[in-house]
Amino acid sequence: MSGAPSPADRGATAEHKRSGEIRGGIRVMIVDDSLTVRTIFKRMVESDRQMVVTGTASSAERAIVQLKGAPADVVLLDLEMPGMGGLEALPQILATSDDVQVLVVSSLTQDGAEHTLAALSTGAADTMLKPRPGGFNEDYRSQLLGKIRALGRDTAEAIGLEAEIAPAGGPARKGPRPGERLLRGKRPEVLAVGASTGGIHALNLMLRALTPEFDLPILVTQHLPSSFMPVFARQIEIASGRRTHIADDGTPIRPGEIAIATGHGHMMVERRGDDLVARVCADPMPSGCLPSVDPMLSSLAEACEGRVLAVILSGMGRDGAEGAAALHRAGGTIYAQDAETSAVWGMPGAVAKADLATLIAPPEMLAEAIMALVPAPLAR
């Protein structure tokens, strides 16, 4: 329900503004219709001296009003609230600042998963499951603060690093290096995509920009809870206009289709005769991620002898860097999302810093380059 902030909200905002002036740090807004949840999140955030709560709101309408007067770096957003609701309010929240990042705090229900994935596709950067009663423990606090810390860091350093990687006086690389066009003379068999925090929005933008004529199989490893994967697959199918499925052990990799890594195992690929098939492995990886991008790219490097085009989108950490290095050694080509459009320039930044990325660009430009790099199907 719309209206002026309640006395409690106004008092909290004034208090947090004074606190922000003293402490500085990552500015956090908490939006949830539950007073209990708002109070718990406030205590957790304020336990970190690098963060300050600039406001709390019991509705999306109140949050939008407060954000216009007290901008935040990170907004913790509940989607299921009376009135406007978090999903409907998301575009307006994102419009309050060019730099604001939204962390969706979602429920474990089917509706909660669908709304969360819709929010991530619209521009929310990351998600965190809201625990059941008694679940707001130290582990949860550590995970929450880690996500806020990653999202709230100033991107200026990342953008500056990207500028150093780019040619002097020019933008980030806008095309293949000399001699690398068509993957050093070989048509790729697969387009492989790795993504994490902020990657779903970027993935949607990139897939929508690929024309129907693009016929390569598309493999996607996205860091998400396994319970979200069926909803994620359905939403990707709608956004891309391509048949999309979760890759089980032994699933054939088919042209023009999208295969998504299951949330409880890594998607790997092996060759059986002339065909490629998916394998599922749950072995621990150095990145600690499940699913991990590294085994997908490393297995493709071997199965396709380097005939792979890989794209690393927005994400926290370094997952994908080792696999990208293996793929590059085998003759494959790697693209990376740029820092300015990434929610977190961790995964693409790691690839760029290692000088593995032929192209560093926004998602739509990556799609253009993919279609320019991959020729029409060869006559058989």
State where each predicted segment sits.
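Conserved acid/base catalytic micro-environments in cytosolic active-site loops
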Residues: 2-30, 34-50, 56, 61-62, ...
